[in-house]
């Protein structure tokens, strides 16, 4: 087995574990805040999403892309920022990681199998959200997340240089090193987005988080609205950053 193959396997496995850790954290927060009837349930979940996202990115970015979100990975593939085969491998690993997170949560839950899955499965708001509300909410939330992920990590700005290493644009300045701040920025984005879908979709903006409890419960209500909104929003957010909002360098 070649060194490159081993690195690919490690990276793919790392993406699965990253998805597992993130998924287990979010599902646990959803379950715990629901069962204890916390008045600050959404705050608990939002903080968990944000802080766990920061920790997972910092912990796994040396061995994998640390997307733990198929919408980000697919957008990276479609904008040619990630190889097709490797990207598909990451997406499969992400889904497996989230499914394993659900499986790990079940023996930890004090309530039954079905009740646990009903709690952690994304559902429209009780205020009367329909499929159209869900679709547009997930579309915009995922587009924002993917744009931030692209701007800070997937496709950050790199000024053009000549053969001597000098900037082509004489007005160019040394770019900001985002390697340290990118996980913080993405994690904070995950956190505030978790509060924005309360009136409609609940705010999932991650096909992996959405699909795992849906598969385990075999309950597919509103699934297409979540999935379509997340993947389409992710693609639009990534494409916008690559083609329109990537800083011009002359």
Curated annotation (Swiss-Prot):
Its main location: membrane. It comes from the Eukaryota. A motif (NPG) lies at residues 206-208. A motif (NPA) lies at residues 69-71. One of its GO terms (molecular function) is water channel activity. It is a multi-pass membrane protein. Water channel required to facilitate the transport of water across membranes. Involved in osmotolerance. This is Aquaporin. The gene is AQP.
């Amino acid at each position: 087995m070649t060194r490159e193959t081993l690195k690919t396997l490690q990276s793919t496995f790392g993406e699965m574990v990253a998805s597992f850790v993130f998924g287990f954290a979010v599902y646990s927060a959803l379950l715990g805040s629901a069962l204890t009837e916390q008045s600050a349930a959404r705050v608990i979940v939002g903080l968990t999403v944000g802080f766990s996202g920061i920790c997972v990115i910092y912990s796994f970015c040396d061995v994998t892309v640390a997307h733990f979100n198929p919408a980000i990975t697919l957008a990276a593939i479609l904008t040619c920022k990630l190889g097709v085969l490797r990207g598909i491998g990451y997406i499969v690993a992400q889904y497996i990681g989230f499914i394993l997170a659900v499986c790990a949560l079940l023996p930890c839950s004090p309530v039954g199998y079905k009740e646990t899955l009903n709690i952690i499965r994304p559902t429209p708001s009780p205020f009367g959200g329909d499929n159209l509300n869900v679709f547009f909410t997930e579309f915009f939330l995922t587009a924002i997340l993917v744009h931030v992920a692209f701007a800070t990590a997937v496709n950050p700005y790199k000024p053009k240089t000549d053969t001597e290493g000098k900037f082509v644009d004489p007005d160019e300045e040394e770019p900001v090193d985002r390697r340290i701040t990118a996980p913080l920025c993405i994690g904070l984005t995950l956190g505030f987005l978790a509060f924005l879908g309360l009136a409609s979709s609940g705010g999932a903006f991650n096909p992996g988080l959405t699909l795992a409890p849906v598969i385990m419960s075999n309950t597919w209500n509103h699934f297409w609205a979540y999935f379509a909104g997340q993947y389409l929003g992710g693609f639009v957010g990534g494409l916008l950053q690559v083609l329109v909002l990537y800083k011009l360098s002359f």
